[in-house]
Amino acid sequence: MKGMLELLPVGSGVALVSAVTWFMLDRDIGLGKWALAGLLVAHGWVHMMYVFPAPEASAAAAGGLAYPFDLGRSWLVTNAGLDAGIVRMIGIGLMLLTFAGFMLAALGTVGVLVPAGWWAGLVLGATATSTALLVLTVSPALLLGFGINAALWVLVLASIWSPVAAPLAR
C-alpha cells in the first residue's frame, strides 16, 4: 500500500493536466491541442525507460515499489521461463513502436507533418503497443500507464475529440 501511495502525486498531476486539457479541448481553445500533444509526447517518452537500467538504490529495498521498467523481471521470464534476451528484444520492439506511434500522434494532433486524419489510428496503435509492453512487465507502478491508455482509447473510440472534428462532442 505504501508503494501505491508514492504514485499519488504523479497520478494527481496527470489527472489535473488531463482535466485542464479536456477543458480546453471542450471549449475549442487552441492551446488544448498542444497540451494533448504534450501529453502524448510525455507518455511516449516514459516508455523509453525500458532501455535504462534500474537505479542503484532500489526503492523496493526501502519498502517502495520495485523498478517497473526492467524487462528482465517480466513474468514471461520469471514465471513462464522464456529467455530474458527474447523478452528484451520483444519489449524493445514494442517500446520503439510505442514511442514512434505517440510522437506521430502528437504531430497529427497539431497538424504538423502528419495528416490529422491519421490521428485516431496512430493513437489506437500506440496505446495497443503500450498496453502490450505494460503487460510484459505488470507492476502496480504501471497502473497509471494502463489508465492513460484506457483514457486515450475512450477519447478515440467514443469519438469524443479528434483534430479533424474539434471541439468535443456534446
What do these predicted ranges mean?
Residues 2-170:
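Membrane-interface extramembranous regions
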